[in-house]
Amino acid sequence: MQHVHPDDKTRSFYTGIGITLAIALVAGVLCKIPYLDIMGQLVLAIMIGMIWGHTIGLKNSHRSGVQFSSKKLLRAGIILLGLRLNLSAMYDAGLHAFLYAGLLLTVALVTVYSLARLFRVNKTLSILTACGTAICGAAAIVAIAPLVKAKESTTAVSVAVIAVLGTMFTLIYTMMYPFLPFTDYQYGIFAGGTLHEIAHAVAASTAGGEEAENIAIVVKLTRVALLVPVAILIGIYMKKREPQNNKQRFSLKTLPIPWFIFGFLAMSAVNTIGFLPESVVNLLISLAYLLLSMAMAGLGLNVEFQAFKKFGFHVFFAGLLGTLILIGCGFGLIYVMGLG
């Protein structure tokens, strides 16, 4: 077996990050071109990443750096983006955001799981795909996977399904935005309540401007926060299904807690107090968008269509139909709840 020198691994790691940075910068230039500007830098970064991944390709040695961008830099960007928000505005949206997000999360969990089982998808893959659709995409899938004892291959398929669906609907939302009967605020609620990943919600909501983006993040982070109670319920359910002689005590310490939400709230508090000069805040927000664009590039590079060939399209169609039902419910609830 060939020995890999630590310096080579480090170089490959930073090369992977460098690829996402290059894509983010190119997307930043392209988004200033007429007709492409409606997509925005974040959506363009996803598209370029997908094109790069399926033409030039991505070396396995570079994947660790790309994963770092798509996960760690995403969270760093979200935290810094908290500087855009005022806590009083979040408080005003709080109850409505919670109810809207909670209702749609329940719809998505029940619908996607039921459809997947109807299409004869195994229980583990059905649970993971339902959680990915309902809560926060790949992050929810990876968090729930140990609770349901999912194999790596099963987790990978679920992540691939959500990545493809989320990216597809992000592009559709962006293209359809001018034709939707929503105010910018309503569009932000809709995007935050129905799209899969945090990255997808942020990318799609940029089409509606700052107001749409702000409320989209609030609604989406409300869904992310609900990962903890969902994980508790799934953990208890799985423990009850274990054979009596194999049962271990369920521990709250093993629960996946999205700590970055507290960083986001802390940055919002800093902005509310007015602790930082406006010039510094603007600089940090620009940095947030660069980090988010790099995360989008990583998301696009990680979309793997090959997984469907091995496991079939049943889970994809369950996710697709479930997402369409989620979108329909999200659309209707905007008016039923009188949001915006």
Curated annotation (Swiss-Prot):
The keyword Acetylation does not apply. Signal peptide: none annotated. The chain crosses the membrane at residues 12-31, 36-58, 94-116, 126-148, 155-177, 215-237, 257-276, 281-303, 315-337. GO terms for cellular component: plasma membrane. It is a multi-pass membrane protein. It is found in: Cell membrane. InterPro entries: UPF0324_pro. Coiled coil: none annotated. The keyword Signal does not apply. Keywords: Cell membrane, Membrane, Transmembrane, Transmembrane helix. Its main location: membrane. Belongs to the UPF0324 family. This is UPF0324 membrane protein OB3406. The lineage of its organism: Bacteria, Bacillati, Bacillota, Bacilli, Bacillales.
